[in-house]
Amino acid sequence: MYRIPRGDISPARRFIDNKQEGVYPVMAKESVWTKLRRKVDKEFAEELQRQQEMERTAREEAKALEKQQKKEAAIAAYREKRDLTVADFFRIADLPLPDDFADIADHTISDFTADPRRLTPDSIFLYWGKSPISAGDPASVLQMAIDSGCLCVISIQPCTHPHTLLLPDTTDALEGTNRIREAYIKASAYIRSLHKAKVITVTGSVGKTSTKEMIEAVLRQHYKNPLISKGNNNSMFSITRNIQSLKRTTNVYLQEVGAFAPKTIEYSARQLAADIAVYTNIGVSHIESYGSQEALTADKLSLSTFGKPDGLAIINYDDPILMGHSFTQQVITYSLKNPQAMYYAKDILRADDGYTFTLACRAAAEEHPAQIHVLGEHNILNAIVAFAVGRALQLPDAEILAGIASYQPSGMRQNLLQAGKYRILADCYNSSLLAVDNTLKVLDELRLPDETKRIVVLGDVLALGDLSEETHREIGRVCTQHKMDLLIGYGIAIRYAIEEAAAAGMQAHYYADRAEMEAAVRAAVRPGDIVLFKASHGVNLGASMDKLFGTDLNESSAIGHKQFRIEVHGDFEFYIFENSASLKTYLGHDAVVEVPAFVTATVTDELHETEVTRDLPVEKIGKTAFRGNEEIREVVLPETVVRIRDGAFQGSGLESLDAPDSLLSIGARAFADCPHLTTVNLPEATDQLGDAVTENSPQAMIMYR
């Protein structure tokens, strides 16, 4: 039955009432009810959604506020502990605060250092007879501190700085404990303790830096801003500087640690409190200072002894000395090929630019295909330990393997590069018997045309003490097992290696004079040949490499590691190196400038350990030599210059340059942005031009004479 209700109520209300009574109007009215219900449901749902969204927003805002408050509280707590006043530093370092320091006691310090070159007006300087420039006499070191205007000086020697704490009797005769050095270590260890960053250390007689760089390649796949020690900056002084650069947000800190003299690694270990200590091997490097391999080993093991008790020691299973010692931390082993180690390689195949191999993890019964794009099987070992470190940090396997594959050597460590018509294998930052053998293996593996000569230039392995002659003779015998057409030796003890090689029938020649060695290389090398340079850093073989082939590796490294002095001679400011000078900046205002060929300076001959006065050839025109100098129109370069570095004349008023016959290379943008430049006249020998050499110099033409 259908009934249309009457009465003084709305049609919608009557419709709903009828439905509840089971009385329905005509079918056309059904759509009215449906539309109304939809409207009500939609409004209800929208209101519910708005309320839920408001509640969710309120919760998120409250959560964000709480997170921000916690972050601000954490930052405040961190800054309260990290921002040290002078009084705080003396308390942490366990030193007495002199009464006459009252006026600076509440002054916030920027840093503390033993390097007077790095002092600022807010620094504290500590001097106990050792510093990164300890070759200088104490008076000059302390004068640098005074001139810096630093806050105060803590010194073993009298000092005229107005705020000086003099501790002349600083060494305990029985314990050998130096109070100032101990203060330095304690303050550094305190700052380390404020940070949650995982600390990874790398030490060993050979391969520290290349291993560190392989691990770095892995870390950079995962972490945005890991703190990594630069180059081979591995002394306690560099470590203290790095520790002070730690941030609250730093996740991981990778530090190479070097051995120099008894207890130097122990001092570093106490500062670092390593979570992971990586050991490459134990050889005889620096044994001259330690007296025995046992003493050297004991010092290296201190990285674990003073590391975190729940940390890891990752050791080379192939090194019998390491395997013969016990460690205070849990031990992880790695090997090139030994399946008894926890990590090792198998199925190694040579590729065009490196190797493919299977990385096996014995404990987890896993295998991973891996590759590296660098020659030398020892780099596979570096990749294996980098994988072990990544696993210890619980990084994804894909990221670890990608990091290993991305590694490329640089600088003066097994760096294969093209220098004009020649190929160079630069590996002269450090050396040892094992390192020489490894590098010669890389040279063996290079696929070269039959007519290409392999020329090897070797220098001394330093700091061997009584083992020097026998080690160098063994190096000579090792050379006979490798591919080379000519062996050239420069240095002192390297003559023993040349004697052994020559006795075996090799073409081998020894030179005690650097200029004679350079002349021999120049006479022997032909376009297409490859030349290997290998020596301890103190031999400074890289300087000869730069001079002979116009490379920039040695000078860039020296500047980066602050291994130079700056001197002003007339209108010229020079970088002073051991064997050469480089024009840093022209200070004058002349339109026509003639650069001197030589600079007389006193330098340290590291190989012979003497101070000498030399006429240093000006071999490089530096990056800021004439940059932005709009007054110059003509520059005359001497016949000693072999390289014009990046940007040397950029943005200058130079009109033309007639380069000397000695010039071999020009860096990137060297003559860019020079509106008046018309010609750069080059000799045929200049066969290395960087990118964009004359960019934005509209009239400039490069011409060969």
What are these regions (language model features)?
Residues 1, 10, 24-25, 571, ...:
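Structural signature of tandem-repeat unit edges
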Residues 27-186, 477-478, 482-492:
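N-terminal leader/targeting and accessory segments in enzymes
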Residues 43-48, 176-317, 321-330, 390, ...:
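Phosphate-binding loop of NTP-binding sites
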Residues 76-77, 202, 411-415, 440, ...:
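ATP-dependent carboxylate/acyl-activation modules
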Residues 96, 122, 155, 159-163, ...:
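Acidic, Mg2+-coordinating active-site environments of NTP-dependent enzymes
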Residues 129-138, 142, 410, 428-506:
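Active-site beta-alpha connecting loops in nucleotide-dependent enzymes
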Residues 561-586:
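Short beta-strand/loop segment at the start of cytosolic alpha/beta domains
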